């Protein structure tokens, strides 16, 4: 290294530390942090939609649908448990912190909708974000994709039974969708009551 005029201090540092964090690598981290912060401040709905779609793999709509008070209490209880808290609860608390921040900034999570929700991505709406079908616990990506393929605005589902048959999903998924109110407008079966 001395043959190519590397300073002595650098050679000694390499001998002591064995590895120095490259400046270019550090700059790349800083630039990325700056870009993320810029998006969070100037394009908040896009930031939150991207974050929840990509990072929050454990996202469960039922947690955010219960409101800000529930979210704060859940986060508080996880922190109070400390090391005793489960890994899943810690993961949920992480995305709930960001969900709470989003709500505090005046945006909201709209209701999951059978026809308007994307199967796997958060959609930007006028009020905030619309969670995907897969954000419901018990409704996996495959079931959400099957529902998206089966739905047709020109030929809406006439019943829960019709949804189950056309999408090829099980009763458990139907029950999960019904539990959170996604199927409130759909009758149980294709049969029509005359009296």
What role is predicted for each listed range?
Residues 1-195:
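Noncatalytic, beta-rich nucleic-acid-contacting surfaces in large DNA/RNA-processing enzymes
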